[in-house]
């Protein structure tokens, strides 16, 4: 009985020490251009097949092996698999650096803020403005959504004026109200009727 119990204990320890995904197929990443050193690091992180599929998207967006490995490690530190291949690729396509993408990943906000972050780039705002807004997102501070920022910009507000509103804690609802007022004022300006004076008939 003691020998059976000991054998059972050893089996449990071995099972606990084994990777949960020993049969993961890393060939898609190899084909996507990842070096063997990167693949070995992913094996140590017990990367799953689904994570490999997500990382292929990141590699296709030309992210380095080190960043890919770091993103998986960051996700595992948060106790979940890496599932943000699309968000990562979109951020890279919008011009965000690998350091910025990794910072967002370590904050566990790739999926939650990638849409807004990409839109900020598409609006045509300065790098400084984008960095300030992104920093507020990462710090959990109230920040206007990208669509509202774009609409405020279209009403003629400067980046400085928009930042003043963001720093004051303006909500999307408040921004929507100001946009409506500014658009109404703009549309009504110059629409008054003026009397046309013509030459009197002889």
How would you name each of these model-derived features?
Residues 5-15:
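Bacterial N-terminal signal peptides
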Residues 18-202:
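General marker for long, soluble alpha-helical cores
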